């Protein structure tokens, strides 16, 4: 835990309007920490995942992908992160990969 950069609660409206299906971050939580409100813990998650159906990946090591994109100047790729097929689960380890 602890403080971390991340998305503000206000980004939810933008993500929804742009029909973003999934996001990944290199931090332990996709939303900014500490919480923007003391009313609830991780309010961004409470809306993004169960209400919007947004798929969220956290603690991704994006260094290699970032370096490869910077080297060739191409920032488009197919990204896949298949999860374990666990009925009723809300989270799973993944095996992510990017194909440039």
Model feature map: region roles:
Residues 1-100:
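Active-/binding-site microenvironments in catalytic and ligand-binding cores
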């Amino acid at each position: 835990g602890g403080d971390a950069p991340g998305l503000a609660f206000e980004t939810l409206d933008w993500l929804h309007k742009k029909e973003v299906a999934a996001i990944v971050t290199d931090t332990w939580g996709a939303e900014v920490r500490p919480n923007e409100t003391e009313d609830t813990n991780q309010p961004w998650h409470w809306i993004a995942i169960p209400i919007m159906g947004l798929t969220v990946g956290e603690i991704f090591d994006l260094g290699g992908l970032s370096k490869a994109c910077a080297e060739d100047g191409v920032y488009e790729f197919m990204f896949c992160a298949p999860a374990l097929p666990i009925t009723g689960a809300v989270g799973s380890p993944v095996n992510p990969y990017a194909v440039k």
